UniProtKB/Swiss-Prot annotation:
Keywords: Calvin cycle, Carbon dioxide fixation. It comes from the Bacteria. InterPro entries: RuBisCO_ssu, RuBisCO_ssu_dom, RuBisCO_ssu_sf. The keyword Lipid biosynthesis does not apply. The basic functional RuBisCO is composed of a large chain homodimer in a 'head-to-tail' conformation. In form I RuBisCO this homodimer is arranged in a barrel-like tetramer with the small subunits forming a tetrameric 'cap' on each end of the 'barrel'. Belongs to the RuBisCO small chain family. RuBisCO catalyzes two reactions: the carboxylation of D-ribulose 1,5-bisphosphate, the primary event in carbon dioxide fixation, as well as the oxidative fragmentation of the pentose substrate. Both reactions occur simultaneously and in competition at the same active site. Although the small subunit is not catalytic it is essential for maximal activity. Heterohexadecamer of 8 large and 8 small subunits. Coiled coil: none annotated. This is Ribulose bisphosphate carboxylase small subunit, chromosomal. The keyword DNA-binding does not apply. It comes from Cupriavidus necator.
Length: 139
């Protein structure tokens, strides 16, 4: 099951050329670019691990692509995403993010239904990868 998170989540995988164009767009907007990775892609897991420091001072898309490739080589079986941070007053938030690396096998999620008092049903989702293996050995 292909995880759909981020700006281009329903499109086919971006090529390095397309990623470079998106990085150039982010840099032209004055946004700071950062890289994050995780082995737990649960939709509520918004706090991924930072790969290095945010690239506030880097203004070259080729340099950022080198960092992306470095992250891909370091974590080939993890999800890696690019985030673009807008530091403009009143925005101060991530304004764009997209996945640039995925594990070869994405097992997906399962729906868990729990019965609560008063005929209440509570639903949640769990990642098959998290259920089967501990952190760091999921993919």
């Amino acid at each position: 099951m292909r995880i759909t998170q981020g700006t281009f989540s329903f499109l086919p995988e971006l090529t390095d050329e397309q990623i470079t164009k998106q990085l150039e767009y982010c840099l032209n907007q004055g946004w700071a670019v950062g890289l994050e990775y995780t082995d737990d892609p649960h939709p509520r897991n918004t706090y991924w691990e930072m790969f290095g420091l945010p690239m506030f001072d880097l203004r070259d898309a080729a340099g950022i692509l080198m960092e992306i490739n470095n992250a891909r080589n370091t974590f080939p079986n993890h999800y890696i995403r690019v985030t673009a941070f807008d530091s403009t007053h009143t925005v101060e938030s991530v304004v764009m993010s997209f996945i640039v690396n995925r594990p070869a096998d994405e097992p997906g999620f399962r729906l868990v239904r729990q019965e609560e008092p008063g005929r209440t049903l509570r639903y949640s989702i769990e990642s098959y990868a998290v259920q089967a293996r501990p952190e760091g050995s999921r993919y």
